[in-house]
From Swiss-Prot:
Designated name of the protein: Glutathione S-transferase alpha-1
Family annotation (Pfam families): GST_C, GST_N
Domain GST N-terminal: 3-83
Protein's organism: Rattus norvegicus
Extra information: In addition to its enzymatic activity, the homodimer of Ya chains, called ligandin, binds various organic anions, xenobiotics, and azocarcinogen dyes.
Name of the coding gene: Gsta1
Keyword presence, Isomerase: yes
Subunit structure: Homodimer. Homodimer or heterodimer of GSTA1 and GSTA2.
EC number(s) given by UniProt: 2.5.1.18, 1.11.1.-, 5.3.3.-
Binding site for glutathione: 9, 45, 54-55, 67-68
Length: 222
């Protein structure tokens, strides 16, 4: 039996993508079992594989882990991407929460009701430009290192890179005023494991399209 982690999710970004990113950055190969129908999801539930009847779920080290943050915490700890002490870990957690907040805001736009789309898009752009990106630009300036925390790669660097790439897809002009973040994006993107994950043919998922959204609605009933 393969010793690789096995990821159970829909064949799209969603809440699994940050997990894919972190595993790839750690140089960990993984397999994926895609949920392609309501029956696939129901079988996982009936077999007792989903603690809260939800995905993402990752099989790793004999466990079936649910909840995105719990999975990320385990991977980061296992592969030494969680800082060198409690203070670094606290900073990593704080920065990560902000990153995930903005990531969620941007990703939710694709399933936003049409009558709310304009207002929510404007809010996401405002939060990106005036709250979140300035905060991380300030961190990079004050810390003065190649990384957000300490002087080596941690999970939060990968989470921030993923976010910056989403921002670039969303509206590339939002990055214009943040030279340190642009340099950070280039720097982290050039790391060997990350560079490999960014290449065509990797397990990185493309932006979701209308067909995928419709398929996901049928499976997950949202």
């Amino acid at each position: 039996m393969s010793g690789k982690p096995v990821l159970h999710y829909f064949n799209a970004r969603g809440r699994m993508e940050c997990i894919r990113w972190l595993l790839a950055a750690a140089g960990v190969e993984f397999d994926e079992k895609f949920i392609q129908s309501p029956e696939d999801l129901e079988k996982l539930k009936k077999d007792g594989n989903l603690m809260f009847d939800q995905v993402p779920m990752v099989e790793i080290d004999g466990m079936k882990l649910a909840q995105t943050r719990a999975i990320l915490n385990y991977i980061a700890t296992k592969y030494d991407l969680y800082g060198k002490d409690m203070k670094e870990r606290a900073l990593i957690d704080m920065y990560t929460e902000g990153i995930l907040d903005l990531t969620e805001m941007i990703m939710q736009l694709v399933i936003c009701p049409p009558d709310q789309k304009e207002a929510k898009t404007a809010l996401a752009k405002d939060r990106t430009k005036n709250r979140y990106l300035p905060a991380f630009e300030k961190v990079l300036k004050s810390h003065g290192q190649d990384y957000l925390v300490g002087n080596r790669l941690t999970r939060v660097d990968i989470h921030l890179l993923e976010l910056l790439l989403y921002v670039e897809e969303f509206d590339a002009s939002l990055l214009t005023s943040f030279p340190l973040l642009k340099a950070f994006k280039s720097r982290i993107s050039s790391l060997p494991n990350v560079k490999k994950f960014l290449q065509p043919g990797s397990q990185r998922k493309l932006p979701v399209d209308a067909k995928q959204i419709e398929e996901a609605r049928k499976i997950f009933k949202f």
